[in-house]
Amino acid sequence: MSRSGSEEERFSSDEGMEELGDFIVSDEEPNHESARDDDAEVHNDRLLQMTSTLKPNESQTQKLLRAHISVLVSALGGPDHTSPISPPPYKLGQDALACLKDIKRWIKSVDEKKGNFDVALACADSGLVVNDLLVILCQWDSQQNSKKPLKNARTMEKIMLSCLELLVLLTWPTDLNSESSENQKLHFASVRKSQIVYKKHILAYNKGQTLKAVIRLVLPTIAKHRIDREPRDNAILRLVLFFIRNVLNIEPANSSISTKSRKHVTNLDNLPTNVNYDDISMNAVLSCFKNNKVLMFLLTLSGSLGTDFDKETFGQPCLECIYLIIKGVKTQDILNPQQNSKQQQRYQQQQREQSQQDQNPIQSVTTTSGLELQDLLSEESKRKKFQTQNISTRHGRFGSLLSIQGNNTSYVISGQEALLDTNSSLAKLDESKKWNNRSHFKYDSDDYVKATSEFLNGSSVIILKEFIEQFLSGGCFNTLIECIGWLLSGTNDLNYVDDYEKACYFLTVAWFLNYKRERNVLFDILGTANLDEDDDGLDYGSVSAGLSEVNFILIISYFRESFEAKNWNSLHVAMICFKELLLISYSIFSRFSDRGLQGEEEADDDQEEIDKELAEGIIRKLFSFNDFLNIVIQIPQTASKHSPEYLSVCISVVHIILKSFESFANENIKLYIQTKRKRTKQNKKSINTLDKATEESLRDVIEGSDDELENERVKEVSRERRLDFKVTEVRFFQTSIVSTYVEYLSRYEELTHEEIKRCLSYFHRLFVIRKDFTGLYRMDFMYILQKLRSYLPKGSSTRDHVDEFIYYFMKKFKNAFERFPNPVEILFPRFEDMEYKIFLATGDLYLKPEKNNKRSSVKIAKNIEFIRDNFSLDEKLKILVTVLYIQEKESLVTWVIQELTKITTNRLMNLSSEQIESNTNEAVQLYPLEQHRRLLINNPYIRLLLTLVGFKVPFILEEPCELPDNVETSNLTECLDSIKMWSNKQPVTFDDGKDAMFFLRTKEGYNYEQDDDYDGHYDENDESIAFETGANPDGERHNLNELDELDKLEAALEGKSNKDTDLPRGVARIKNKKPKKDLPKKSKANSRKKHLSRRPPKSFKVVSDGEEEKQEKTKSAEFVHGSDDESDYEKENEFFDREERLRRLLEESGGIVNPKQLAEFKVSWSKLESSNGTDTAISVSKAIENTSFVEDTMPHTQNIPEELTLGAINESNSDIDTSSDSEPELNGSGAESVSAIENDKTSVSSFTPDIHNETSSKKRHIILQDRDSEDEVDITTGNHEIKASNPRKRRVVISDDEE
């Protein structure tokens, strides 16, 4: 057995040496030959002899590693006992720097890469930090103070930096979580104990001289200018900050992961031997930091961030140091030291008297242990006092039993507290029960919040208060928070920032805001006489960075992201910071309200106005988004499932919000909140039930200015609404939040009187002010209220409030109990449905009101018709009833039959003789059932069925289905019989086996399918409507009915044949469109341009191409133009001037200017049609001559000045559109004339009201052209130009050139 054991040791040793072979230096050659017999001697190695014995839970590799670290530490150096100096100085080894670097390599390669603590434990066992590193640094600092020249100063500095690096690595914070490796879980407690030993010796050795030596290392770096610093200098400065951070962060491990315990977390006492909490407490840290200039170093560094030091490099370490200093410290302990000193003096007197009697030494009250003991003794005395109140009976010294007997059972209660009163007897009976319900609290929200507070003695309070005052008055807080806020705001997503770093930032901001607020409140009470000149002022300027816009954005983003990710630890931190912001705002308002009630007048009105704006700005910035307010309301609903500290913060936030909203409502302050919703662009809607061609043409006219909305179907818009404080307050009184308050109050023994009053204030607001009685008719609440009353002392003011509330509560509950003798509902939380609320409160049934909003409406069904008009009424009803049965709408047919039966019966029974003689009936309105109401809107078959019967079908949900009085009873009876008959004969078959749907089709006209957003409602107060959509009598698109005959008029003037139409003679048919397959493919831009060119202009103005492009850029100018009031008068004058010129030209040229001329034109045209004229141009010329529109001679042209030149023609030609899409087709000589004009580079438009937008100057050309020759007369009125031509038969083309 021994032989096999030695072989296993040898094999494990070989494996360990292979694993650590890179770091082992051996002079021996490796022997790879195997032993030939079992008795061969094992290689005698010094390291192997040191690792022959293993400790529990230790491997051979770990033992070998420990031996190598021990060798390196020994080679580093040690005390020089040959020196006559006592104590002997430390003497470095010859290769001290190499040893330090080797140890660093071991830590990096083993501990960090493999996730182990083996090297750290080996260094702790060898005493590297305590016996070597600290001694080396302190001895070097003493030599620097003596100002004696040092040998090898450069090498010594390198050794000091290596010592600092090892100190930082060995004191680096270690955390235990579920992701830790097995090695880390196993050795976590040992590593933490070793770090506690390091912290004790760092603070105690030579009164913390190690810290002074470390700061001395970085002094040359600080003295350099920022530009002159090298990366190495910044690395040294960063190492010093990390070392200070590590010293502050080292604390005893208070928890470890356990897989066997139900709680999964086991509390342990992890203080090593010979170390007590006073050695590493905050009192010792602050005293050591003060004596060794560490606090001054932090002030210098944090105040110079961004200017002398890089904020990205040093900002976060500085913030962590400040956070760890103030962590767990209550601001009241710093601001009220007198109260603490009185308690300490009282406690010292009591302990002194007790020690004289017992002759036992006591712990000093100035130590941390003494302060902690004082707190525990005060809690014990309070509990003893409560216990003596309950057991002070006449039989207090005797044991007794109390028997409670029922019909079949009996209970026996023992104990003196059961004899006090009935409540105590029942409580004792409840204590005897076995409870199996487990705690529902999840302590998953306190990782960054320290539950236990720090106990500071008098000297530590003075040191910390002085540091805080200097930190605020010197602007260090603002500089530090601005730098960290800049770093956080520069990150695209806060999720990529470490949670601990974010927690440090927000907790630091919250602590200093709390300190500043409490300090201002204290000086308001005591006055400013105790305020020194160097102290911080009473305004909030020293913490302005915490109230900046950047910080509000960060806190809201951090709040929202933590809630969405269900990161309760981060959410707890966010709520603490959020609470402090609310408290600052509320404290300012409460201070001003108190001054107003007392009638005090403030001399500094400017400062008061600034504070008011600050308070309002805080609330406005925090509650500027509706979704954030929703999150704030949702958080308290589940707060009872988490830790008591988390629950307490949630209750405080709700309390402050309600108080702030109340103050805002009293001050009549308006708060606007942004809400986000999704707005769907409404599809293009048809104007009237017109044919498709007219509908498409008019749609371009109406919605031509809405091109910018066509690219975006769904658009998210933001709008601001005024926050209704009363409505928002109601949301904080949901049943789930009430349950949270009840759960919070159930811990009344752990609550202060202020916290109990906070709960009572909430219940008073709910029950008394809002009179929501049923919300508190709960058995658990009544039971807690009764226990709370018994717990509070009789002389307490809180008990008086509880008594008053109980009296009012029972008075209302008695009335409710009389109405409901069996109140089963009090056993459960109330339902939030209005039916239950109204019934429990009043006993009445709740009638749910019909919603009158857009979303409750439905689309209007398409209009359908029969494929033939010769169907009889009976056949039509047969088809519709069959379709409804196919769609499984039998209930709808049954409802129609029932309603028709009622109407006919009432008419036959209620008609008097006078009504029979007069043959008059009353109109009937039908209000369908809820399940049928929507079908009357969106089902076309039932709508057609009711229409056939004679009903007027509704178009919106609120509109009834009305039967006019002119519908005869006989017709109703006939329809009723037919519907009954075909309903009973279902299923019905048709000829040729066709389906009933075959005989129906959709009407042409209004396209309801595109109108999918129409709901029949219009709310004039709806904020989503930008402007009124009614016709504007002054607008440019008012007379849309004038556009109805555009296509007809165009076809008539083009002279196309109407042989394929059924229109009467003299009426132009609608122009045929080319099939889509024959049309060339064009881009959307060209298609859009073509539609615009074919579009009738606004108010029939002739617009040039340049102006068209200009108007395309200006969208909806009629409604959104910024200078409408200034430019309307000029536009009107310009418009009337153009119209006057056009009218004058028409009169001079013989145009149609009155209805008489138009009638004559129609008569002449009809005669030409009857004479079978083939040439349209000839017909037009004859019609013009017969109606004397244009004379052969031109007397009006003779009066035009001769200064006119031909330049106007060339000028107008450049602006004329010669597109083939817009040119009309001419037959015969008309076509020849067009070609002739094109050859002359002159464009002639057709005589049609569909005037193309083909000019851009403010001139009008009248081109008189002979159809037989190319001679022409050009009359230009703008520049007075005349071009003479052959005065024969001519046709007139009018074009409007204007910009």
UniProtKB/Swiss-Prot annotation:
Region (Disordered): 1-41, 338-364, 1052-1134, 1209-1299
Compositional bias annotation for Acidic residues: 15-28
GO CC aspect terms: replication fork protection complex
GO BP annotation list: DNA repair; DNA replication checkpoint signaling; meiotic cell cycle; replication fork arrest
Any coiled-coil regions, as ranges: none
Record flagged with keyword Nucleotidyltransferase: no
GO molecular function term, any single one: DNA binding
Subcellular location per the Swiss-Prot or TrEMBL entry: Nucleus
Pfam families: TIMELESS
Keyword Nucleus listed: yes
Function per UniProt: Involved in chromosome segregation during meiosis and DNA damage repair.
PANTHER family in the cross-refs: PROTEIN TIMELESS HOMOLOG (PTHR22940:SF4), TIMEOUT/TIMELESS-2 (PTHR22940)
Entry's family note: Belongs to the timeless family.
Name under which the protein is recorded: Topoisomerase 1-associated factor 1
Organism of derivation: Debaryomyces hansenii (strain ATCC 36239 / CBS 767 / BCRC 21394 / JCM 1990 / NBRC 0083 / IGC 2968)
